[in-house]
Amino acid sequence: MLARTFLGMAISAFLASTGVQAAWSSNGPNVMYYWGQNSAGGSNTQASLGTYCESGQVDAVLLSFLHVFNVGGTPEINLSSACAGTYFPNTQLLSCPAVGADIKKCQDKGVKVILSLGGAAGVYGFTSDAQGQQFAQTIWNLFGGGSSDTRPFGDAVIDGVDLDIEGGASTGYAAFVNALRQKFSSNFLIGAAPQCPFPDAILGSVLNSASFDYVNVQFYNNYCSATGSSFNFDTWDNWAKTTSPNKNVKIMFTIPGSPTAAGSGYVPMSTLQTIVPSLASEYSSYGGVSVWDASQAWNNGDFSSQLYSLVHSGGSTPPPSSSTIKTTTKATTTSTKTTTTAAPTATSAPGSCPVANQSCSTQNQYACTADGKYAVCDHGKWVVSSCPSGTVCIPTTDGTSIYCGYATGSGSTCPSASALEIAAASFGSKNGPVPRPYKASKVAAQLAVTSTDKNSFEAVINARRTTLTPFEKSVTIEFTTPSNIKFTESDMGPVRQVGNKVRIQAKNDYNESMTLVVKVKGSINSGVFVAPSTSAWKFK
């Protein structure tokens, strides 16, 4: 309670000294935050909804999440500690009057409040268009202008709905969106949160057949994160202009709010200061920045204040103010990634590709060649080698190294550049091959190789259910790896490898979830990291 009181005093002082007033703009750019899940995990790391709206650093807040649809019955919401324990009689639906009061407070300040549906945990989806239409009526009655005895936020009315559909099937969502359009006013916002691989495994067809106001593309936990050479904002911009039913749809650059907010893809402010102005100047569909989530960003130094200034000033970021708002520092500890001194850095200048026997300056520097091979700087000369059959050279998601992987598409993946060099280059020029999806029964997955060095690697397995049946508490992942690669650990449970057969016993953070994000590590016995085969993956 003391921490919250101090926080409120700090905000009041900040607003008094600056007079900052955030407000949503239909033309953008805007800054949006997911709020409710307290993913930072501390007892005081998430402030009240109204606190963030009063900060002057937020244009829209996404209430996260309505995670159980229960079509035909009463849905369920989960806002972590912001609303817990008080249910409507004979239901599992929370009553959250304090959140309802804060919704009105936010709206009075011009901040949009949007209800996000789905998320990683929970059970959701439709079996028919009729169910989608029926659920739109439920949203109208419980959160819109309709009436019900079980309105979680009282008479507060939300400003929009966000589809953060991490798993399941696409059935019914277009009908749901179209039904919402008929019930709510024309300024009601409807958005979606696809992952960056295009098209999205779940929402791809929905985005092509229904009208959305914005799309929060998740540029993290995948190969297409912003710091890698496969950053594909240009692909989403092209979709917005050529395929989207709403040609004025805004593409939001959605990122983690701190290094611990996602398995991979965090972008430091020094790099954002290059990327954000480039996006704003190059793509007319750019709508601003969305962040997962508020608890992470507000416990990451001056991230939130610097980001708001960056987005709304066209790129210049002033020094941190002494009145910058912060929540109490998270009490729990997290592991910090370490790198070895033998990392195969990839710092070739944009536009240049290694050629065999040409000179190079950095011993053990690795890079991709123009024809999909990989080069190693060995005693001042490039030594070029072919990737194993069926694979090509692909840069890692952190932009500092390379690996050999199975890919779709064609073209050059060189040069592998540093994150800052990638950001400075033209985003529209990256048309090379991208990692091929991993498919298993009822699961779509991606393996994002985060980093490699001469002896080790780190990667993220991002798995999504493609049916309405969620992952359970314990999930066994099995696949085959090349003979030079040894998987040794994961952040979700023990790893066992016999020969080239790998088994991960993942302990899900949730009893039921539509997605799994598993961080893995291992060793490289010789050569470079080679990705596992895309076939014969099993999730049990």
Curated annotation (Swiss-Prot):
The active site is at E166 (proton donor). It is an enzyme of class 3 (hydrolase). The keyword Lyase does not apply. Pfam families: CBM_19, Glyco_hydro_18. Residues 353-404 are annotated as: Chitin-binding, high affinity. It is found in: Secreted. GO terms for cellular component: extracellular region. Residues 322-348 have a biased composition (Low complexity). InterPro entries: CBM19, Cts1-like, Glyco_hydro18_cat, Glyco_hydro_18_chit_AS, Glycoside_hydrolase_SF, Glycosyl_Hydrlase18_Chitinase. GO terms for molecular function: chitin binding; endochitinase activity. Monomer. Belongs to the glycosyl hydrolase 18 family. Chitinase class III subfamily. This is Chitinase 1. It comes from Rhizopus oligosporus.
